[in-house]
Amino acid sequence: REVSPIATDYVKAQEGETSSSAVTLSLIRDTTNDYIFPSKGTKATVSVTHAGGPLEGDANYTQYGASLFAYFPLPLDVVFAAKGRIGYIQDHEGVEIPVSNRYVLGGINSLRGFRYVGPTNGGTSDVIGGTNMMVFNVELVLPFIKESGMKLVAFYDAGNSWDNKYDMGDLRQSVGAGIRWYSPIGPLRLEYGHVLDRGELNDDSKGRWEFTIGMPM
């Protein structure tokens, strides 16, 4: 792949074409009452992904992940949602895990308000991602225009990615609000995240608007 000419040597070393082959095994238990906008129940997932080895390719690692989403109905059709995800990537035979396969958080599906979150390289602002990650999301979803399938959401996000550790005292945080619409072309989300701790290098903005077509994370 192409990289910026001002990127660090670590990132430049991964320029060019690479290939990887991986297989994923997932176990999911879903008791939620709706596939798009659930209001009660839980969804638990554990997964293992292996790349390289007999599958060949340039990458050689095993990735472990787990998540738990819980939804609780409240009066007036309000829904409280609590979500947590954790992940770990283990390299094999000393093969460096490519930046594209490491955990880089930020954006509407992890830490809203941030562009990129994760370990940087050489004291620069180049986020190269981590081998461990943890994300927590808390949401309050309120009906807005029931006939049109529109909802309002207020949220709090916390999480980070690290190299070879988890640090609960080092979580990036944001709060925000948005609107969700189950439109004829699918679920639409427009949300603004305000960064509570801007950090030293990872992200200079105070927050950002984000839009996506698809299911909530």
Question: What do these predicted regions represent?
Answer:
Residues 166-217:
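C-terminal beta-signal and terminal closure region of outer-membrane beta-barrel proteins
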Residues 51, 159, 193-195:
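An acidic- and aromatic-residue-enriched active-site/binding cleft used to recognize and process polar
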Residues 1-150, 154-155, 162-165, 203, ...:
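C-terminal outer-membrane beta-barrel translocator/porin domains of Gram-negative envelope proteins
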